[in-house]
Amino acid sequence: MMDEMEQKICALVDARKDEIIAFAQDLWTHAELGFQEHRSAGKFAGIMKGLGLRTEEGLAVTGVKSYLKNSSDGPTICLMGELDGLPIPNHAYANPETGAAHCCGHNAQMAGVMGAALALSDPEVAAALHGNVVFFGVPAEEYVEIEKRNEMRRQGLIRYGCGKCELLRIGALDDVDIVVGHHASCEKKYLVANRSCNGFITKLYRFEGRSANAAGAPQDGIDAMSAANIAMHAVDVQRETFRDQDTVRVHGCLTKGGGAANIIADDVRMEYSIRGKTIEAYLDAARKVDRSMRAGAVATGCGLTITTLPGNLPIVPVKDATVVEDALKLVCGDTPVTWTGPEFHSTSSGDYGDISCQMPLLQFNTGGFRGHLHSADVELADPYDAYVVPAKVFALIAYKLLKGTADRARAIMESFEAVLTREQYLGSDGEHAHQRAHGLTAPAAPEGHHLCGLMSLLAVLFKRPHHPKSREICKERSRRHRSPSSVGLYRSTSIKRWFVRHNDLLNPRSEGTSK
């Protein structure tokens, strides 16, 4: 049963449902990609300012943070929605210029946060909250356009590839005690999402060969595409080495694959996401993928550059998420509330993982869509379920956490054990913390590591062409280490001594790689 204030909150949301739906549909038809959500952020900020809320803009490029109260003695609850879409250009409402589409339902999250703000900013409701509420539109949850984001990193515009990681880095969440997040569903459901999720790391691979006439003089070339083919097959044969309990996922794509069929490819590039249940699991898998890429380079005589980018940390469940269940039960009607608790693990990843390592994270799922998320067939099924229901749930969770003396919020905060403090996450310099959290130690530049020294040696021994810039490139390498496991692979005494001295070429320490 709802108490009087809960009834008022739901009535306030229902009274503004047309505005909530209109806002959501506006975002639906004008999706933007991560760190580029200027229009969406501007729309959200305008509504928050219209409610008289103090609002900060441009956080982590496009983030928007609004405060219900200017100060408070109680806990601060952050209701968080994600601004960005996915690059799915064949979706019916994809942005014709960028291909962005809201195929993950982030527009529903933003509608939920916006609708909750409409209700909680009512003076009577706000007075009943012993604490503060932050309404946050965050950028770049989807880890896409990796090359573009890497360029933004080089320019100093961002340091991490996802928005929440950037917000943590710049201190925009320092005053937040509990974060509440929402996920859209293509089923009619009311779900308490208190599960763990995989973390991941991202790899960029570049094979550098030599172009030649593929018909007239293929022997003069070094085929970077062949190197990539060998590497991808080598990755596939690694899969049987991944332990089931580590829930490892390795998936990638070619981002550049040569320019013409009759020209030996001299520049082939790939992106890989490497996921696992624990940091140790996905770092182990990443080493195996790196090893597979080196195998392709060794076999063909190509140069190889490996760039390692931090992804997201695994999501850590809270000990008590019953407040989410209680809020869902008030709006679910005859549909039962379901749970995915700590015993359930998802192989997906998200930048909520980084948040969950430092502060309590409460999450819920609601429906209103049909089709398949992250697919071109996702479409709106029920505007009320998709947009208005999340607003009620967001607002009810905030109220339940902060009603009275905010006992439920304080209990969650007291039972939470941080995996990383802010200081541990950021480190003493605040620059390479995320890399350290992922077991990565090297700074962001210079990029990559190279096998060209090894290629030069093999070229001398076997009279094969080698990368023309091998000596120059190898001078750029910033770190080397030894891996005893590689030494025993080579039995020829004449070559073995060279490999013993230079086996770091087989297992080099690349940008951001520690092992």
Short names for language-model regions:
Residues 2-103, 107-134, 139:
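Acidic/His- and Gly-rich active-site-bordering loop/insert found
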Residues 2-4, 226-452:
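Metal-dependent amide/peptide-bond hydrolase catalytic core
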Residues 27, 79, 106, 135, ...:
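Divalent metal-coordination and catalytic microenvironments
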Residues 91-101, 107-108, 123-251, 258-263:
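Histidine/acidic-residue-rich, glycine-tolerant segments that coordinate divalent metal ions
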Residues 504-514:
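Short, intrinsically disordered C-terminal tails of secreted or membrane-associated proteins
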